[in-house]
Swiss-Prot record:
Residues 272-287 have a biased composition (Low complexity). It comes from Homo sapiens (Human). The modification N-acetylalanine is found at residue 2. It is found in: Cytoplasm; Nucleus. This is Interferon regulatory factor 2-binding protein 2.
Length: 587
């Protein structure tokens, strides 16, 4: 009995045309040209299911997916009208005939067997029925006899109709992507060195290439090659656009451009060369380089890398080298970007290094780097540890801080710069942060910390864990008062510098404190209390009234004589430890 029920259930199931799985009748949709299940319709989208069905129909015909005695679902009524399965070569000939480009000189639209959504092809021609195949075969064979060539897939001849394994799967789709050579219009695809011979018929362009290809003259090809990135040959698709010889020639030209000597720059006397003149020369030489291979370097980069390089370049060096870097010619020659103020010997070598390392995309009229709040933000990349050290624009520093110093001695230094050779993105974020502040030059060596809180607000339990700097954020206070800059007021620091030099201890019981679990007085940085002492102090002062600092003093708020007091929520949080323990024991 159970076997009979199973047979009846299996007989009621309908096979989906796309996923070829047996489905129950309530899971099938009959609104399209073939019966498809609801899962396929939801996955593909109701507006694209017809295109997918047409693609699947062509694939099944081309590859002979149906064994003997089995026909595609729903094809019993039209089985007599459909011819036997066709090969991919026949489909190519039929498409040539239908598009009206049956001549041997025209480049046909290649049947991309692995493309999933033939949007352009399906939108330009009506769906082909079985009778179309039968009527078009003799004409196609007369117009162009079949050749034993394998079918072109994405413009590359492969023996079995499948694309190469090393190509990413997005090359098999018709959606535009940067690897399809979209920078060159389809009607202006040349053999990149100006060859006037058209592409052979077998090399059909895989994407949405037009049927007619115009050969471009040598000047047009050269202008296209210099203005657009030649990433067509770099992504293993040389057969569809250019020959291997053309690619080699392009590489030789690019190498020649990089090796040619720089244009001679006008130099005045060494004693009259000022900082602005040196900056103008550096900017002009960088702009001249960017018109060569620099543009291609910038264009070939991803968008985020281009934005980062642009932002970092705009904050370039505009001041003279300091004494430390003058004493170390190894740093000056190859690793640092900039120039010397006397301009006698080191300027050309360093400017050439800067031109190779940092192509400038800004317009030529711009002289020197833009300034933030009247001060330039130079970044000196030291390529040893990836640490970015800003040259301090004030003349009071004899030398910039060494790489071993904390990166927080200057506000213009990224706070994450000393960690693992931080990427330029963090530096870029901090540059944007400094650009938004109106007092970046005043507190140039104030500790830049996201944990700084408003001193007028009473402490809260949510911010209790944020009232002390991390170990890496405190070391900069030692270098804070150097060079005659404005010293940091101690009250603006959320913690004392004892956090790294000595272990944290409770002010009352002198027991060691946990890293993130203690009570910090917002007025006196040295007042730190463990939770048991804080609870005892709150109970002694009376939790119902005003509860002041657990040290017994009425520590005033910064900038006023009013002593701070705990909020009721903070008192409840501190006292909640005992209650929670009792509840856990009771349960």
């Amino acid at each position: 009995m159970a076997a009979a029920v199973a047979v009846a259930a299996a007989s009621r199931r309908q096979s989906c045309y796309l996923c070829d799985l047996p489905r129950m009748p309530w899971a099938m949709i009959w609104d399209f040209t073939e019966p498809v299940c609801r899962g396929c319709v939801n996955y593909e989208g109701a507006d694209r299911v017809e295109f997918v069905i047409e693609t699947a129909r062509q694939l099944k015909r081309a590859h002979g997916c149906f064994p003997e005695g089995r026909s595609p679902p729903g094809a019993a009524a039209s089985a007599a009208a459909k011819p036997p399965p066709l090969s991919a070569k026949d489909i190519l000939l039929q498409q040539q005939q239908q598009l009206g480009h049956g001549g041997p000189e025209a480049a046909p639209r290649a049947p991309q067997a692995l493309e999933r959504y033939p949007l352009a092809a399906a939108a330009e021609r009506p769906p082909r029925l079985g009778s179309d195949f039968g009527s078009s075969r003799p004409a196609a064979s007369l117009a162009q006899p079949p050749t034993p060539q394998p079918p072109p897939v994405n413009g590359i001849l492969v023996p079995n109709g499948f694309s190469k394994l090393e190509e990413p799967p997005e090359l098999n789709r018709q959606s535009p992507n940067p690897r399809r050579g979209h920078a060159v219009p389809p009607t202006l695809v040349p053999l990149m060195n100006g060859s006037a011979t058209p592409l052979p018929t077998a090399l059909g362009l895989g994407g949405r290439a037009a049927a007619s290809l115009a050969a471009v003259s040598g000047t047009a090809a050269a202008s296209l090659g210099s203005a657009q990135p030649t990433d067509l040959g770099a992504h293993k698709r040389p057969a569809s656009v250019s020959s291997s010889a053309a690619v080699e020639h392009e590489q030789r030209e690019a190498a020649a451009k990089e090796k040619q000597p720089p244009p001679p720059a006008h130099r005045g006397p060494a004693d009259s060369l000022s900082t602005a003149a040196g900056a103008a020369e550096l900017s002009a030489e960088g702009a001249g380089k960017s018109r060569g291979s620099g543009e291609q370097d910038w264009v070939n980069r991803p968008k985020t890398v281009r934005d980062t390089l642009l932002a970092l370049h705009q904050h370039g060096h505009s001041g003279p080298f300091e004494s430390k870097f003058k004493k170390e010619p190894a740093l000056t020659a190859g690793r640092l970007l900039g120039f010397e103020a006397n301009g006698a010997n080191g300027s050309k070598a360093v400017a050439r290094t800067a031109r190779k390392r940092k192509p400038s995309p800004e317009p030529e009229g711009e002289v020197g780097p833009p300034k933030i709040n009247g001060e330039a933000q130079p970044w000196l990349s030291t390529s040893t540890e990836g640490l970015k050290i800003p040259m301090t624009p004030t003349s009071s520093f004899v030398s910039p801080p060494p790489p071993t110093a904390s990166p927080h001695s200057n506000r213009t230094t990224p706070p994450e710069a000393a960690q693992n050779g931080q990427s330029p993105m963090a530096a870029l974020i901090l540059v944007a942060d400094n650009a938004g502040g109106s007092h970046a030059s005043k507190d140039a060596n104030q500790v830049h910390s996201t944990t700084r809180r408003n001193s007028n607000s009473p402490p809260s339990p949510s911010s209790m864990n944020q009232r002390r700097l991390g170990p890496r954020e405190v070391g900069g206070q030692g270098a804070g008062n150097t060079g005659g800059l404005e010293p940091v007021h101690p009250a603006s620091l959320p913690d004392s510098s004892l956090a790294t030099s000595a272990p944290l201890c409770c002010t009352l019981c002198h027991e060691r404190l946990e890293d993130t679990h203690f009570v910090q007085c917002p007025s006196v940085p040295s007042h730190k209390f463990c939770f048991p002492c804080s609870r005892q102090s709150i109970k002694q002062q009376g939790a119902s009234g005003e509860v002041y600092c657990p040290s017994g003093e009425k520590c005033p708020l910064v900038g006023s004589n009013v002593p701070w007091a705990f909020m009721q929520g903070e008192i409840a949080t501190i006292l909640a430890g005992d209650v929670k323990v009792k509840k856990e024991r009771d349960s």
